[in-house]
Amino acid sequence: MFYSLTIISILEVLLVLVPSLLAVAYVTVAERKTMASMQRRLGPNAVGYLGLLQAFADALKLLLKEYVALTQANMTLFFLGPVITLIFSLLGYAVIPYGPSLVIQDVNLGILYMLAVSSLATYGILLAGWSANSKYAFLGSLRSAAQLISYELVLSSAILLVIMLTGSFNLGVNTESQRAVLFVLPLLPIFIIFFIGSIAETNRAPFDLAEAESELVSGFMTEHAAVVFVFFFLAEYGSIVLMCILTSILFLGGYLFINLKDVFNILDFVYSNLFIFEINWMVSERSYTEDFFNNYKSILEGWLYGWIIGLKSSIMIFIFILGRASFPRIRYDQLMGFCWTVLLPIIFALIILVPCILESFYILPWNLNLF
């Protein structure tokens, strides 16, 4: 019994982890193809059909590269930093609801778990930059730590407003609360602020000051190459995919698009009425078909839910890519000033304003029990 439960748990993790890593691989291809199209270039088109296998060719190239060990670096922490960053980047997928019951671990404090995991990834960046014994890497890690800590305040404050509407830290409850209306409509300013904070939290352009090529060569990743660089690469794009999924859950309804239960009820009705005029020799065939339909209905439902949340997340990823191709990199002082003097005052004002608006609905005339 113990071994069967262990195998099932491992399969559940692999069912989430493998598609997530494949999504990370194809996000890189989509980014290069999109930027090439905007800049009137061809982009990757030689490896596989339309360049779809370019990510695997790049991964093979990095894995086969020779790594030159640094004599002045703390090699234990130097290797440990990228691994820590990748682990905490992947741990966030454990609480993502891909359907009403399609989640590895349904945690009541799932939102707090996501914020904690994203915060701990900063330690890996700091360790990697400090242990390299390089000025460029160390400055890049300090920039990244200050940027991540600053914009985590923006993200957590924006999420707080969503929690005020739902009354729960559970991501599944937040998704189900949007069956009537998506939160992106009443909370549009908060959605915009959260999206800007997500770009800064994932070190993407125009907020990629931690790895500014013109100033810091490659930031905290300057001395990392070959296999070690792959960990940082997967962690960065894994965080992008995770933040886009979180955005789609909090504001775009996650896996909600149409009520799939109503669709399957209609299919059940159609199926049951197809056999009104059946004859006796078809009874056994019908029972077999009915069992097959009932068993695989849940699989089809989960597959559809996964496609819905994947489509919404892909739209957010595409907006990330458009931001990188459209906007120039800002200065570091502008980045920090924008957080502390613009975004935080606005979000704090909204934290006061939104509860007042919600409370005002309870004292409107049509809510007063006068008769």
Swiss-Prot record:
GO MF terms, alphabetically ordered: NADH dehydrogenase (ubiquinone) activity
InterPro entries named in the record: NADH_UbQ_OxRdtase_su1/FPO, NADH_UbQ_OxRdtase_su1_CS
Membrane topology classification: Multi-pass membrane protein
Major location (coarse): mitochondrion
Keyword terms: Electron transport, Membrane, Mitochondrion, Mitochondrion inner membrane, NAD, Respiratory chain, Translocase, Transmembrane, Transmembrane helix, Transport, Ubiquinone
GO CC, alphabetical: mitochondrial inner membrane; respiratory chain complex I
Reactions catalysed: a ubiquinone + NADH + 5 H(+)(in) = a ubiquinol + NAD(+) + 4 H(+)(out)
GO biological process, one term: aerobic respiration
Keyword Glycosyltransferase assigned: no
Enzyme Commission (EC) number: 7.1.1.2
PROSITE patterns (UniProt xref): COMPLEX1_ND1_1, COMPLEX1_ND1_2
Compartments (UniProt record): Mitochondrion inner membrane
Segments traversing the membrane: 7-27, 44-64, 77-97, 109-129, 153-173, 180-200, 226-246, 263-283, 302-322, 338-358
Group of enzyme by EC: translocase
A Pfam family it matches: NADHdh
Disulphide-bonded residues: none
Family: Belongs to the complex I subunit 1 family.
Described purpose of this protein according to its UniProt entry: Core subunit of the mitochondrial membrane respiratory chain NADH dehydrogenase (Complex I) that is believed to belong to the minimal assembly required for catalysis. Complex I functions in the transfer of electrons from NADH to the respiratory chain. The immediate electron acceptor for the enzyme is believed to be ubiquinone.
Protein name in the entry: NADH-ubiquinone oxidoreductase chain 1
Organism: Neurospora crassa (strain ATCC 24698 / 74-OR23-1A / CBS 708.71 / DSM 1257 / FGSC 987)
